UniProtKB/Swiss-Prot annotation:
Role of this protein: Catalyzes the conversion of 4-hydroxy-tetrahydrodipicolinate (HTPA) to tetrahydrodipicolinate.
Binding-site list for NADP(+): 37
Gene name in the database record: dapB
InterPro entries per the UniProt record, alphabetical: DapB_C, DapB_N, DapB_N_CS, DHDPR_bac, NAD(P)-bd_dom_sf
The name this protein goes by in its record: 4-hydroxy-tetrahydrodipicolinate reductase
């Protein structure tokens, strides 16, 4: 069976290294190349020797070449690089999977950019988180008069706030309540007047330690609190989820997809 050639943008970041190792261990895929910035001292070196796995692909500094040698490209970087990848993917007509987070990525309307390729963007490739989002949507619909609060704990280096995962849960709750997401949120710590009604979704953010990822969403009434929790025990779950998503996406027709689309197709 022919293996799917997967190119990785940002291959030497934390997530990139996990992806290199996970893909290299797969019977269905292989790393075609990994992109690093021009001038990086690892350009031309074998990724397996850098990461410590069985991978013969090399680190390169040409985005165009990465797309040329890949069946699909995966990127977990930043919004500016994501835009560059979208333009190149459209030019080369190659599928693109993005896990880039942050406000700029969250506000992008990908349908304005994607015309000729299958494209999947998500702020969390964990199957558990995306299943939780479905449960949250249903809970928000049924518990229509409960207050909703989202809390997260991440490592001290986490830049975006609230995190992409918190926003996934918030969007799910807003969808369950049938209210616009942007109007249904405030960040805890602002004046209490910010909570205008039960459809306002609150966010509380904590930072500390070096390798934490914990999310809770609470539905609170005067009489009870229902608490959903997702805790990451091993960050390899993101690499596993990204590989599964890439192997699914490469077979899809052009369009903008979500993790929900992939999970629905598997039902």
């Amino acid at each position: 069976m022919t293996k799917v050639n997967i190119g990785i943008v940002g291959c030497l970041g934390k997530q990139g290294k996990r992806l290199v190792a996970e893909i290299s261990a797969s019977p269905n895929a292989q790393v075609s190349a990994g992109l690093v910035r021009p001038g990086n001292p690892y350009v031309g070196q074998v990724l397996g020797e850098i990461v410590g796995c069985n991978c013969s692909a090399k680190a390169i500094d040409s985005l165009e070449h990465l797309f040329d040698v890949s069946d699909i490209v995966v990127e977990f970087t930043n919004p500016q690089t994501l835009l560059e990848c979208i333009k190149m993917a459209e030019s080369k007509k190659k599928p693109l999977l993005s896990g880039t987070t942050g406000p700029a990525a969250t506000e992008m309307v990908f349908e304005d950019y994607i015309k000729n390729i299958p494209f999947l963007w998500t702020t969390n490739v964990s199957f558990g988180v995306n299943i939780l989002a479905k449960l949250v949507e249903e809970a928000a619909r049924k518990l229509f008069d409960y207050d909703i609060e989202v809390w997260e704990m991440h490592h001290r280096y986490k830049k975006d706030s609230p995190s992409g995962t918190s926003l996934i849960l918030g969007r799910a709750a807003a969808k369950g309540r049938n209210v616009p997401f942007k109007k249904a949120q405030y960040v805890s710590g602002t004046p209490q007047e910010a909570r205008q009604d039960v459809n306002t979704i609150g966010y509380a953010v904590s930072r500390g330690g070096s390798d934490l990822s914990d999310h809770r969403i609470m539905f609170v009434s005067d009489e009870e609190m229902i608490d959903f929790n997702h805790r990451t025990l091993n960050k390899n779950l993101y690499a596993k989820g990204a590989l599964k998503a890439a192997l699914w996406l490469v077979k899809q027709p052009p369009g903008v997809y979500t993790m929900s689309d992939m999970m629905a197709a598997a039902e």
